[in-house]
Amino acid sequence: IDTENLATQIAHRVGVSKAEMETLIESIPQHLAPLKGTVKILSDLKSAGHDLFFLSNMPASYAHYLESTHDFFQYFSDGLFSARVQCIKPSAKIFEMANNKFKVSGKNTIFIDDVKHNVEAAELHGWAGIWFQSPTQLRQTLVNSQLLKA
């Protein structure tokens, strides 16, 4: 979704003007940063030999900002930003797009997300799912699953 459409949808829901919402949306990117500990998990997964891909429900302006200011994208082989493919999680279509683009499928594909219904959608699609709640919880889950060493 682009900034204009996002602003229109949110403004309508919360009762503010579209212009006010656009201003707010445009001010957010500089505040985006990875959670402490998550980049280390990406690095460790990559070092363990896992191919990493991302699916992100993010407006195009946020995606561009993150790509140009953060180096954690180096750990990913590829990814999909919803704004660029005009499809969002939890739509089954975005998981199909990912299967085709990344050449992945089935239980060997592990989907990690902080939104439970997105994880459930991935599981319905046949992927294994991990509901992210904190870096500590994620690391422990990955260790328990033998995807990372303790």
Predicted feature locations:
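Conserved phosphate-coupling serine/threonine residues in phosphotransfer and NTP-handling enzymes
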Residues: S56
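Helix-loop "lid/cap" segments that line or gate small-molecule binding pockets
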Residues: I1-V16
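Asp-based, Mg2+/Mn2+-dependent phosphohydrolase catalytic module
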Residues: P59-A60, E67-A150
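Amphipathic alpha-helical interaction elements
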Residues: V16, Q30, W127-I130
